[in-house]
């Protein structure tokens, strides 16, 4: 069943046809249609109708919005349809905005498709007839799972295409053509904005079953150094084979990332969680050493925090994400260690209380444990960790001593307040009911005030 946006696209195409033009679905919509993937982002391109006539047609169908006048892109209010005129682009500088755009309604479909990045994205589908135009072998590449650039000359003008190739490879499980890999090696990514980088990175992290492919392909393209140098530093950092049969820290991180992708739907903060999985072992390159013939990475979870902070700040100014990721990095080893050591309840409560998100911390611990190429997929620590988390959540759901309780007892806010509330919180973690905890807190205040 067609939604209102598809219906509007067909209406536009009908009006355009009456004026002697043609309307095509373009870009990812055609690709996803052929792959059997739902895509509600409707992009259409209008050929054979001048801009003034197109605006007249659109005005008869609704309120026209100009989304990019210089790009020849329009919309209709209340509809999610991008309506574009054919255009040619040429780079005028290194920045992503440094392009000269020339719109030409009579450019022709083949020349218009020439500006597309990959053959699979250069396919065009006639909105009215369903005819698919394929000028560069896109259907064959799509069927064979190949990501191949359309035109070498135009491809190198937008360095973001290096990352787009990598994220498409991760999302669709495709391989990048050797000639596209070779071309990507020559491109300079330094002028890209952090927003464009994170846009492609997060598509891989959030949409791919195997986000590791994104980084594996960037490694093949020799493009880790500009935006992801910390990832490059993981390569060839050894790990003890007895605990890590998968090999170096790079291999481990790739496996953990894929395990995390299988768990992200269960995470409270799935996007943050995927970043945490990515960076959790960034401390190993700076701590790994061989002592008496054995490989150790002592304190890597703490020593990695400045490395993680630098990495995150390069990609985003989102403080909540940084706080979450740093906290998860510091604590990522604790749950499995406590479970393996049969630690007491108090130790678990302390760790959960230090965590920004205990539920996600356990998911990260699971991904870390399973990301080791183990033949056995059992995770024996999971039951006790879940039991301890249930205890913690139960304690946090109970009534507890708050500031207003102290005020009601006649205690004026002052220096002892925080100390008293901290003590009350420790009693809460120990399972002491509020009615028993409050007298103990008040007694502490009296003792402290009298000393």
Locate each region found by the language model.
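Catalytic cores of the polymerase beta-like nucleotidyltransferase superfamily
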Residues: 1-451
């Amino acid at each position: 069943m067609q939604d209102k946006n598809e219906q509007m696209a067909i209406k536009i195409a009908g009006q355009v046809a009456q004026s002697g033009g043609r309307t095509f679905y373009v870009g990812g919509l055609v690709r996803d249609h052929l792959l059997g993937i739902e895509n509600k982002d409707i992009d259409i391109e209008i050929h054979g109708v001048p801009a003034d006539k197109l605006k007249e047609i659109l005005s008869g169908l609704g309120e026209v919005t100009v989304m990019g006048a210089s790009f020849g892109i329009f919309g209709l209010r209340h509809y999610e349809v991008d309506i574009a005129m054919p255009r040619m682009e040429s780079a005028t500088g290194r920045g992503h905005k440094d392009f000269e755009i020339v719109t030409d309604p009579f450019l022709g479909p083949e020349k218009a498709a020439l500006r597309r990045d990959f053959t699979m994205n250069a396919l065009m589908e006639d909105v009215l007839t369903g005819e698919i135009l394929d000028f560069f072998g896109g259907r064959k590449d799509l069927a064979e799972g190949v990501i191949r650039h359309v035109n070498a000359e135009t491809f190198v003008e937008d360095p973001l295409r290096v990352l787009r190739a990598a994220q498409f490879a991760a999302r669709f499980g495709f391989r990048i053509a050797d000639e596209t890999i070779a071309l990507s090696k020559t491109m300079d990514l330094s002028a890209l904005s952090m927003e464009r980088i994170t846009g492609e990175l997060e598509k891989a992290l959030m949409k791919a079953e195997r986000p590791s492919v994104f980084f594996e392909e960037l490694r093949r393209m020799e493009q880790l150094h500009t935006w992801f140098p910390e990832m490059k530093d993981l390569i060839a950092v050894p790990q003890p084979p007895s605990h890590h049969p998968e090999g170096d820290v790079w291999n481990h991180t790739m496996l953990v990332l894929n395990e995390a992708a299988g768990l992200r739907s269960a995470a409270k903060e799935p996007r943050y969680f995927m970043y945490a999985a990515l960076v959790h072992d960034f401390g190993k390159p700076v701590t790994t050493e061989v002592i008496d013939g054995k490989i150790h990475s002592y304190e890597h979870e703490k020593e990695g925090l400045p490395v993680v902070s630098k990495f995150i700040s390069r990609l985003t100014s989102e403080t909540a994400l940084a706080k979450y990721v740093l906290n998860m990095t510091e604590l990522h080893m604790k749950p499995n260690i406590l479970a393996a050591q049969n630690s007491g309840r108090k130790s678990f409560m302390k760790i959960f209380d230090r965590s920004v998100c205990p539920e996600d911390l356990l998911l990260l611990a699971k991904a870390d444990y399973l990301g080791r190429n183990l033949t056995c997929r059992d995770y024996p620590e999971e039951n006790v960790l879940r039991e301890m988390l249930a205890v913690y959540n139960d304690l946090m759901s109970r009534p507890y001593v708050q500031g207003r309780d102290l005020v009601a007892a006649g205690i004026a806010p002052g220096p002892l307040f925080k100390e008293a509330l901290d003590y009350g919180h420790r009693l809460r973690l120990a399972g002491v009911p509020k009615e028993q905890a409050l007298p103990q807190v008040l007694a502490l205040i009296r003792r402290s005030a009298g000393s």
